[in-house]
UniProtKB/Swiss-Prot annotation:
Activator of cell division through the inhibition of FtsZ GTPase activity, therefore promoting FtsZ assembly into bundles of protofilaments necessary for the formation of the division Z ring. It is recruited early at mid-cell but it is not essential for cell division. Belongs to the ZapA family. Type 2 subfamily. Gene3D superfamilies: 6.10.250.790. One of its GO terms (biological process) is septin ring assembly. Keywords: Cell cycle, Cell division, Cytoplasm, Septation. This is Cell division protein ZapA.
Amino acid sequence: MSQQKGKKSRINVEIYGQQYSVVGDESTSHIRMVAAIVDDKMRELNAKNPSLDTSRLAVLTAVNVIHDYIKLKEEHEKLKESMTKKGME
């Protein structure tokens, strides 16, 4: 849920042991949730690839997250098509 137009949220978050100041249109709770997911994903991938440096780990995390996003987007499109064919939309 977006905040009022033009109103930005600023929050400090910790991702993989580093502090970041994040500014966005979403609520602070949304930004915290996004940061927590990124942190969790980085830690999950680090457990599987402990020799990766932080930069490579960050890129691998981005690749994995975008992969998940694309898969969900494709599933969403298939569901929309299915609903349209059944006259549910």
